[in-house]
């Protein structure tokens, strides 16, 4: 059978990995690598580890531990801890608001009996009685008075092993530390005009922001980090903390290095990125209540903006990756609203924006290093899209929000019909937010992400601002253009080739002779006979087959087989562990949702249509796994593909893998499969439709989903080449025997050929309809 080609592609995909491995080993053994650093390597040894480059940034990053600074008198900023690191005993800091608070801190060495000592406090000699009963720890005491002529009182001692102390002005109070390390805590003194309190430090000190108070407490209790305790750390003047205000030129060109022929230029640029999403909405056939696809697609946007008085023309191309496929099925009736697939971007998705402008930075963007960029975030909120039904209220998909966060930048190329542009690709990761999206008049609600229905929400564009910096190797003569690696500057875009090839393939459907098609569908086509219509050597044919398998193993069909294999493995292991589970021959089989059925028997599907649709997803895979003598949809699909490949004038080795994979997924989308049990036939379609009938009368009978599931497991699955509608029409107009009905139900190729040779218009019309569904 012609569908042997698809089965070979499914079973032989492992050869792709083997081929890649052999190719890599051969390349590694055969390649000679010569490293010539050149005059721009910064060092005579290769390979060169290039740095990140300079990016002008107005954002100030506040250090955790700022200092040490030399002793001085200053007005500490509020909400900042002044961490004192004294080396000898005595007064370490004092401060006053000159009104009602004079406060000083004194350090006393260990093991001091009660004694009188004289200290210089605020320019006066003051005698105080002090002591330190600890044998190992140093003692900090606060002394304060509330009037200029009053007496000092002692407060809040701190016994410290690291010999560190801290003070902070905040919220009308002066905060200090007290207690015993390593369990010291903060205390405070109330004061008026606290923000005007000047302090004099008599030892080195550090500055720590209040939001890092936990770190400050850690230092008080356990000491400074080791790097601060080396002799190489030298205190500097507090004036070093002052900011010199200069006007930065963000948009500038800097010559990094230069020789007679080449120079390295660093380009720093402000950029404004404007972009928008595009989508494809495809309505399914029928009465107008079904939609087959709502998906994102790339779009290029051209705009102008002003940068430092210069008008810039820019291009952006926006695309998405890692989309999530959702679907909605309102029921099995032709008038039930349904969406086969609609795409949503969420946290696991990425947005790519390729940016190019007509400035000097992009003119020679071929050899680039030290590429860096800083961009803002942007929030994208979806709008509303109404599904215009022939009758009744319109369902409306509305809402959805994602925020784009910059996640990297790389070099890329934007392709147009006439020129290829070296550009930058900005990658954005996503987070979801409110509002969620929903479809009115359905149960779809409170879902998060941005659906493809109306991602721009009537906006002309979204906008992101930021900066970029890069170093580019360019000719020393500015009039020269950097030579490009290849000589072809205008590239035939692969997507454009595929578009033209799809149009050609679809037009060739009229030229296929049905009798030849049936014969071709019965041939055991393998991969090489399938592709023999392309003029190429044997080696090229082998390479082509490998390329087809590389692409095919990423197809939806191959992914479904892989998922099914995993599910069967899970089922086998689960059955062996549980004696309460029914055998795999029952409806909880690999051809239903086996892993779900095994792990949660109590969970059942609510409606017959949903159960049937769940099983129907597996029917094609079951048919591939259990080949019968009858003809199937894949036989016709492969035969049509072979015929069109032979007739095509545009097929090439580069487009063939895409075409073969796309054909396996999109040819004959409206498939119905059947199983036969004596005189009863059960049919289920990929669209969720299901029915049962008797062979002799074609009268419908109640559909037993449990019986259908059991039959799918135990009986062969047959492609409904001749559907029930055609069979009824054939019986009413020509009359057929029960045996002929059985043969047509089994898709017997011999009987089909007889009807076609007899020019039976009903059978011919059905086969022609299937051929016309073989579209890309």
Curated annotation (Swiss-Prot):
Residues 510-776 are annotated as: Spike foot. The keyword Membrane applies. It comes from Rotavirus A (strain RVA/Pig/Mexico/YM/1983/G11P9[7]) (RV-A). The record marks 101, 190 as: Binding to sialic acid. Pfam families: Rota_VP4_MID (PF17477), VP4_haemagglut (PF00426), VP4_helical (PF17478). A motif (YGL motif) lies at residues 448-450. A motif (KID motif) lies at residues 644-646. Residues 248-479 are annotated as: Spike body and stalk (antigen domain). GO terms for cellular component: host cell endoplasmic reticulum-Golgi intermediate compartment; host cell plasma membrane; host cell rough endoplasmic reticulum; host cytoskeleton; membrane; viral outer capsid. A motif (DGE motif) lies at residues 308-310. It comes from the Viruses. Keywords: Capsid protein, Coiled coil, Disulfide bond, Hemagglutinin, Host cell membrane, Host cytoplasm, Host cytoskeleton, Host endoplasmic reticulum, Host membrane, Host-virus interaction, Membrane, Outer capsid protein, Viral attachment to host cell, Viral penetration into host cytoplasm, Viral penetration via permeabilization of host membrane, Virion, Virus entry into host cell. The keyword Zinc does not apply. Residues 65-224 are annotated as: Spike head. GO terms for biological process: permeabilization of host organelle membrane involved in viral entry into host cell; virion attachment to host cell. Residues 389-409 are annotated as: Hydrophobic. This is Outer capsid protein VP4. Residues 484-518 form a coiled coil. In group A rotaviruses, VP4 defines the P serotype. Some rotavirus strains are neuraminidase-sensitive and require sialic acid to attach to the cell surface. Some rotavirus strains are integrin-dependent. Some rotavirus strains depend on ganglioside for their entry into the host cell. Hsp70 also seems to be involved in the entry of some strains. Belongs to the rotavirus VP4 family. SUPFAM superfamilies: Concanavalin A-like lectins/glucanases, VP4 membrane interaction domain. Disulfide bonds join 203-216, 318-380.
């Amino acid at each position: 059978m012609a569908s042997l080609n698809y089965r070979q592609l499914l079973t032989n995909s492992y050869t792709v990995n083997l081929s890649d491995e052999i190719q890599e080993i051969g390349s590694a053994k055969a390649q000679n690598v010569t490293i010539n650093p050149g005059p721009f390597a910064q060092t005579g040894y290769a390979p060169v580890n290039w740095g990140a480059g300079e990016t002008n940034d107005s954002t100030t990053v506040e250090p955790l531990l700022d200092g040490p600074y030399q002793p001085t008198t200053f007005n500490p900023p509020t909400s900042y801890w002044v961490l004192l690191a004294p080396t000898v005993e005595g007064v370490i800091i004092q401060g006053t608001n000159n009104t009602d608070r004079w406060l000083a801190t004194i350090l006393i060495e260990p093991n001091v009996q009660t004694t009188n000592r004289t200290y210089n406090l605020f320019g006066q000699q003051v005698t105080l009685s002090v002591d330190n009963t600890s044998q190992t720890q140093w003692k900090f005491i606060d002394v304060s008075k509330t009037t200029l002529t009053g007496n000092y009182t002692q407060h809040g001692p701190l016994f410290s092993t690291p010999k560190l102390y801290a003070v902070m002005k905040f919220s009308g109070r002066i905060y200090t530390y007290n207690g015993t390390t390593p369990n010291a805590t903060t205390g405070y003194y109330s004061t008026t005009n606290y923000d005007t309190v000047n302090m004099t430090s008599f030892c080195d000190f550090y500055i720590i922001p209040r939001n890092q108070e936990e770190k400050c407490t850690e230092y008080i209790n356990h000491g400074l980090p080791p790097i601060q305790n080396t002799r190489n750390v030298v205190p500097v003047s507090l004036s070093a903390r002052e900011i010199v205000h200069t006007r930065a030129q963000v948009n500038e060109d800097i010559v990094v290095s230069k020789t007679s022929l080449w120079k390295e230029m660093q380009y720093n640029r402000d950029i404004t990125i404007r972009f928008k999403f595009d989508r494809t909405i495809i309505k399914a056939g029928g009465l107008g209540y079904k939609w087959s696809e709502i998906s994102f697609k790339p779009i290029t946007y051209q705009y102008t903006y002003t940068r430092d008085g210069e008008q810039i023309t820019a291009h952006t191309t926006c695309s998405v990756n890692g989309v999530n496929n959702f679907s909605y099925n309102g029921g099995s009736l032709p008038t039930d609203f349904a969406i086969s697939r609609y795409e949503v971007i969420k946290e696991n998705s990425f947005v790519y924006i390729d940016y190019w402008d007509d400035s000097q930075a992009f003119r020679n963007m071929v050899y680039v290093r030290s590429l860096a960029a800083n961009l803002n975030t942007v929030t994208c909120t979806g709008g509303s899209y109404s599904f215009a039904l022939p009758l009744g209220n319109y369902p409306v998909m509305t809402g959805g929000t994602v925020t784009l966060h910059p996640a990297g930048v790389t070099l890329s190329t934007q392709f147009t019909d006439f020129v290829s542009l070296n550009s930058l690709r900005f990658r954005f990761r996503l987070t979801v937010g409110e509002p969620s999206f929903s479809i009115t008049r359905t149960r779809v609600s409170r879902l998060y992400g941005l659906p493809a229905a109306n991602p721009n929400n009537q906006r002309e564009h979204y906008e992101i601002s930021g900066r970029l910096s890069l170093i580019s190797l360019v000719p020393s003569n500015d009039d020269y253009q950097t030579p490009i690696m290849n000589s072809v500057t205008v590239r035939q875009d692969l997507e454009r080739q595929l578009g033209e090839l799809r149009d050609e393939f679809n037009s060739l459907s009229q030229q296929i002779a049905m009798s030849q098609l049936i014969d071709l569908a019965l041939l055991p086509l393998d991969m090489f006979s399938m592709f023999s219509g392309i003029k190429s050597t044997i080696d090229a044919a082998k390479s082509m087959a490998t390329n087809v398998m590389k692409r095919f193993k990423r197809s939806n069909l191959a992914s479904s087989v892989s998922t099914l294999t995993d599910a069967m493995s899970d089922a086998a292991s689960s059955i062996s562990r549980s004696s309460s589970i029914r055998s795999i021959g029952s409806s909880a089989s690999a051809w239903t949702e086996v892993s779900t059925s095994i792990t949660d028997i109590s969970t059942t599907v609510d409606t017959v249509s949903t159960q049937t649709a769940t099983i129907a997803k597996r029917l094609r895979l079951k048919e591939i796994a259990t080949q019968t003598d009858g003809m199937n949809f894949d036989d016709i699909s492969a035969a049509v593909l072979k015929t069109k490949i032979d007739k095509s004038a545009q097929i090439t080795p580069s487009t063939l893998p895409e075409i073969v994979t796309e054909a396996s997924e999109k040819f004959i989308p409206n498939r119905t499969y059947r199983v036969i049990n004596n005189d009863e036939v059960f049919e289920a379609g990929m669209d969720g439709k299901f029915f049962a009938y008797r062979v002799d009368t074609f009268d419908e009978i109640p559909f037993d989903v449990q019986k259908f599931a059991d039959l799918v497991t135990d009986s062969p699955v047959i492609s409904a080449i001749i559907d029930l509608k055609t069979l009824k029409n054939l019986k009413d107009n020509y009359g057929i025997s029960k045996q002929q009905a059985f043969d047509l139900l089994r898709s017997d190729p011999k009987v089909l050929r007889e009807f076609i040779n007899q020019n039976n218009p009903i059978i011919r019309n059905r086969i022609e309809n299937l051929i016309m569904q073989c579209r890309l």
